[in-house]
Regions:
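Short glycine- and basic-residue-enriched patches
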Residues: 1-163
Length: 163
C-alpha cells in the first residue's frame, strides 16, 4: 500500500483504490489524488482529493483494501487544498467553572502561557488536535473537574470541525 501511495504523493498522481468506511462498510473503488501522509497521534491517514465526493478528504490507511493502482497526473494538488493550506490556532484554556487554584493547576499541567495553550494547526487537522486533547466540541461535561479544558476560539474553528 505504501509504495504506490508515496509515489502518488511525490509525483502528483491519481490512485485507484478500494476503501471501506463506517458509511460504506463494503469496499468501494475510489479515485483519489493523495498529497500528504498524516499521523494524528492515533493512526495514519492520507490527505487526498476524492473524485467521488469532489473534495479533499482524509483516508485512514488501514481502511485501504488491496494495493492501489497508480494512474495519471492529477489536476488536484496540495496547493489547491484550502483545508491543508489554511493555518489556524486552537486556543485551549482551563474550564471557566474551575476555581482559580484549579485553573492554575491546569495551566501548569498543559504548559499554558497567560492562561492559554496555543496549538498551531492546519484547518484540515483541527479535529485531530481536539481528539488528542480529548475535547468533544459538541459536548460540555456537567462537572468542570471532568472537563478541565475548553477551546476558547471554538466559533472560529467551526469550519474545520466534523458536523
Amino acid at each position: 500500500v505504501l509504495r504506490p501511495l508515496l509515489k502518488a504523493c511525490r509525483e502528483g498522481l491519481r490512485l485507484e483504490t478500494d476503501y471501506v468506511s463506517f458509511t460504506t462498510p463494503v469496499a468501494e473503488t475510489r479515485l483519489i489524488a493523495p498529497h500528504t501522509l498524516v499521523y494524528t497521534g492515533m493512526r495514519w491517514h492520507v490527505r487526498a482529493y476524492c473524485e467521488k465526493n469532489g473534495a479533499y478528504r482524509d483516508f485512514v490507511l488501514s481502511r485501504l483494501r488491496g494495493e492501489p493502482d497508480v494512474l495519471d497526473i492529477s489536476e488536484f494538488s496540495r496547493e489547491a487544498d484550502t483545508g491543508w493550506n489554511t493555518r489556524v490556532n486552537v486556543i485551549i484554556e482551563p474550564d471557566q467553572r474551575l476555581t482559580a487554584e484549579q485553573k492554575r493547576i491546569i495551566e501548569i499541567d498543559y504548559g499554558m502561557q497567560n492562561g492559554q495553550l496555543i496549538v498551531p494547526s492546519r484547518g484540515a487537522l483541527v479535529q485531530y488536535v481536539l481528539q488528542r486533547f480529548q475535547i468533544d466540541a459538541n459536548k460540555v461535561e456537567s462537572k468542570a473537574s471532568a472537563q478541565q479544558i475548553v477551546v476558547a476560539n471554538l466559533d472560529a474553528l467551526q469550519p474545520w470541525l466534523y458536523h
